[in-house]
UniProtKB/Swiss-Prot annotation:
It comes from Xanthomonas axonopodis pv. citri (strain 306). Alpha(8)-beta(8). The alpha component is a flavoprotein, the beta component is a hemoprotein. This is Sulfite reductase [NADPH] hemoprotein beta-component. It is an enzyme of class 1 (oxidoreductase). Pathway: Sulfur metabolism; hydrogen sulfide biosynthesis; hydrogen sulfide from sulfite (NADPH route): step 1/1. Belongs to the nitrite and sulfite reductase 4Fe-4S domain family. It comes from the Bacteria. HAMAP family: CysI. The lineage of its organism: Bacteria, Pseudomonadati, Pseudomonadota, Gammaproteobacteria, Lysobacterales. The gene is cysI. The keyword Ligase does not apply. Its EC number is 1.8.1.2. PROSITE patterns: NIR_SIR.
Length: 568
C-alpha cells in the first residue's frame, strides 16, 4: 500500500522505515514502496534499466532493478586517495563508470540491492558519505569550482562546508542501517531542530558563487551566497533566494524561476541566515501539493516581502543592503591556471561528466593514472568537468603527459566551443522520469548542429547548450541560450534566450519537435546572429535574440531575470 510522501516521512522513525527488512528480502531486487522514498535521504534512488524493461516484461520477469548512489561532497573536493577508492567502487559494484553531477557530486549507477550496503560502507570508508544527497533536505552544496585559486576561494569553500554540516539531519538512521552503528535509547525519535519530523516540503539546494564567475548558476538555487570580495578579501555574502529549475509540461501552475537578491550578510551571520531560510521553507512551504512545494512557489505564493521579513525575524537581524557585484559568465576556464600561491590548476573538459573507458576514450584509466601520481586534488565543477588542482609547476609535465596519453582533454583541445559549454542530465536508460534521451544524445546533437555553426562562422563562438530528458531540469536547461527539454522519445521543446551569466531564463520557441525541425528552426536564427551580432561587446546568442526581438520574456507569474544594471 502506498502512502503520501508526507505520511511516509512522519511515520518513518527518522528515516528508518522498513529499510533493513527491504534490504534483507532476497525475493525481489526492489525495495518496499515506502522505502523507495526513504532511501533517497540516504543518498540513493531505486531505478531500473529502461532499455530492457519491455523485454523483461515479455519474459515475465520483474524490471532489472538497480540503484543509483550519490555522494555528499560539498564543492566537489576529493583527494587522489579518495579518487582511487571511488574508482575501485565503481569498478567492483557499479557499471564501471563515475559520473560528475551538475551539483559537484559523484553518482554510481547500476548497483544491485544485495550489494547496496557493501557499496555504502565502501564509500564511507573513504571518509565520504551519501547522507542527504537526495530527498526533502538540503542537498549537496555547490561551491565555485576551485577553492585553491586564492585564499578567498578557500574561505568560500570552508564556509560552504560549514553550511553543509550544519544542515545535515540529526537522525542516526544512516549510521545504523549502513554502518552497523549500535542503537541507543531514543533511536527513532532523535530531535531534528532544523527539519522536524517531516523534514522539508521538497528538496532544497544551496550554492556559493565567487564573482565574476557564476559557474554554480547561483540563481538556480533555493538559497545562494554570492561572495563579496574587496581587494582580495572576503567581506561576506549577498543572499539570493527562490531559484529553481523544475516544471511540468503543460502545467501553468509550475515554472522555473531565477532567484531574488535580498541583501548582504557577514560570514559570522552565515549559519543563522541559512537556518532561518531553511526553517521558513519548512513551515511555510506547500505540503499538500508536491509539485508546488519548492521554495520558489513559497515565495511567489506568500510574496517576497513577507518571506524576507520572516527570514529576518527568525535570524534575529535584518539583512544589510546588497553589495555591488557582477558576473561575466557561467562556464569553466579550461587549461592551466595559476593560483595566488604559485600552484597550478588544470580544468579538463569531460562531456556530460561521464568518466568511463570506452572504444574512443580511456577517461577512467587516465584519471586513475593521474590519481596515482598523488599530486594536488580533484575538484568537480558544476559544469560536469574536473579540475586537477594544487599542482606544483615541477609536476605539470607529468600530468600533461598522462592527459595526452589517455586523451583526457579531448573535450577542450579538439572539440567545439559548443561542446565545451554543453551539459546534459543522465536521462535514459536509468532515470525513471526521463521522457527522452539527454546524455546519450548530446554528442549526436552537437555533431548535427556543428555544420550549421561552421556554415555561419560560429564554430568557435561560445553558446550555452543544455539537454534535459524531462522538464525537471537537472541540467539547468532553463538558463541556457539553447536548450532541449525532452517531451517524448526523439521529441523536445526548444527553449531559447538564456544568457552566458546564468541570470535570465529562456523561453519556449518551438514545442514537441524532432531533430530536423530543431535544426530548421535554429538555422535562420544562427544566420542572423552571425550577420547582425554586436562584435564589439561580444554579444551572446541569447542576448542577440532578445535585442533583435526574435524572442521576448512573456508575461509570467514569477521572477525571470536578474536586472544587470543593479549589479555593476
Amino acid at each position: 500500500m502506498s502512502h503520501s510522501v508526507e505520511d511516509i516521512k512522519s511515520e518513518s522513525r527518522r528515516l528508518r522505515g522498513s529499510l533493513e527488512q527491504s534490504l534483507a528480502d532476497a525475493v525481489t531486487g526492489a525495495l518496499r514502496e515506502d522505502d523507495q522514498t526513504l532511501i533517497k535521504y540516504h543518498g540513493s534512488y531505486q531505478q531500473d534499466d529502461r532499455d530492457i524493461r519491455d523485454e523483461r516484461r515479455r519474459q515475465k520477469l520483474e524490471p532489472a532493478y538497480q540503484f543509483m548512489i550519490r555522494t555528499r561532497t560539498p564543492g566537489g573536493v576529493i583527494t587522489p586517495t579518495q579518487w582511487l577508492a571511488l574508482d575501485g567502487i565503481a569498478t567492483r559494484y557499479a557499471n564501471h563508470s563515475l559520473r560528475i553531477t551538475t551539483r559537484q557530486a559523484f553518482q554510481f549507477h547500476g548497483v544491485i540491492k544485495r550489494e547496496l550496503k557493501a557499496t555504502m560502507q565502501a564509500i564511507n570508508a573513504t571518509l565520504i558519505d551519501t547522507l542527504a544527497a537526495c530527498g526533502d533536505v538540503n542537498r549537496n552544496v555547490q561551491v565555485a569550482a576551485n577553492p585553491l585559486l586564492s585564499q578567498a576561494h578557500a574561505t568560500l569553500y570552508a564556509d560552504a562546508a560549514r553550511v553543509s554540516e550544519h544542515l545535515l539531519p540529526n537522525t542516526r538512521a544512516y549510521y545504523e542501517i549502513w554502518l552497523d552503528e549500535e542503537r541507543v535509547s531514543g533511536s527513532g525519535s532523535e530531535d531534528e531542530p532544523i527539519y522536524g519530523e517531516r523534514y522539508l516540503p521538497r528538496k532544497f539546494k544551496i550554492g556559493f558563487a565567487a564573482p565574476p564567475l557564476n559557474d554554480v548558476d547561483v540563481f538556480a538555487n533555493d538559497l545562494g551566497f554570492i561572495a563579496i570580495l574587496r581587494d582580495g578579501q572576503l567581506l561576506g555574502y549577498n543572499v539570493s533566494i527562490g531559484g529553481g529549475m523544475g516544471a511540468s509540461h503543460g502545467d501553468a501552475e509550475t515554472w522555473p524561476r531565477v532567484a531574488n537578491v535580498i541583501g548582504f550578510v557577514t560570514r559570522e551571520q552565515l549559519l543563522d541566515i541559512a537556518t532561518a531560510v531553511v526553517t521558513t521553507q519548512r513551515d511555510f512551504g506547500n505540503r499538500a501539493v508536491r509539485k508546488r512545494a519548492r521554495f520558489k512557489y513559497t515565495i511567489d505564493d506568500h510574496g517576497l516581502d513577507t518571506i524576507v521579513a520572516e527570514i529576518a525575524r527568525r535570524a534575529g537581524f535584518a539583512l544589510q543592503p546588497a553589495q555591488p557585484f557582477a558576473f561575466d559568465h557561467n562556464g569553466d576556464r579550461y587549461g592551466w591556471v595559476e593560483g595566488e600561491d604559485g600552484l597550478w590548476h588544470l580544468t579538463l573538459s569531460l562531456p556530460a561528466g561521464r568518466i568511463a573507458d570506452t572504444d574512443t576514450a580511456a577517461h577512467l584509466s587516465g584519471l586513475r593514472a593521474i590519481a596515482q601520481l598523488n599530486v594536488g586534488e580533484f575538484r568537480m565543477t558544476p559544469n560536469q568537468n574536473l579540475v586537477i588542482a594544487g599542482v606544483l609547476a615541477s609536476e605539470r609535465a607529468r600530468v600533461d603527459a598522462l592527459v595526452a596519453h589517455y586523451g583526457l582533454d579531448a573535450g577542450n583541445q579538439s572539440a567545439t566551443a559548443l561542446a565545451r559549454g554543453a551539459m546534459a542530465c543522465v536521462a535514459l536508460p536509468t532515470c525513471g522520469l526521463a521522457m527522452a534521451e539527454a546524455e546519450r544524445y548530446l554528442p549526436d546533437f552537437g555533431a548535427a548542429l556543428q555544420p550549421l555553426l561552421q556554415q555561419h562562422g560560429l564554430a568557435e563562438t561560445p553558446i550555452v547548450l543544455r539537454l534535459s530528458g524531462c522538464p525537471n531540469g537537472c541540467s539547468r536547461p532553463y538558463l541556457a541560450e539553447i536548450a532541449l527539454v525532452g517531451k517524448a522519445p526523439g521529441r523536445y521543446n526548444l527553449m531559447l534566450g538564456g544568457d552566458r551569466r546564468g541570470q535570465r531564463l529562456n523561453t519556449l520557441y518551438r514545442e514537441n519537435i524532432t531533430e530536423p525541425e530543431i535544426l530548421a528552426a535554429l538555422e535562420p536564427l544562427l544566420a542572423r546572429y552571425a550577420a547582425e551580432r554586436d562584435h564589439a561587446n561580444d554579444e551572446g546568442f541569447g542576448d542577440f535574440l532578445h535585442r533583435a526581438g526574435v524572442i521576448a520574456l512573456p508575461p509570467y507569474p514569477t521572477h525571470r531575470r536578474l536586472d544587470l544594471e543593479l549589479l555593476a
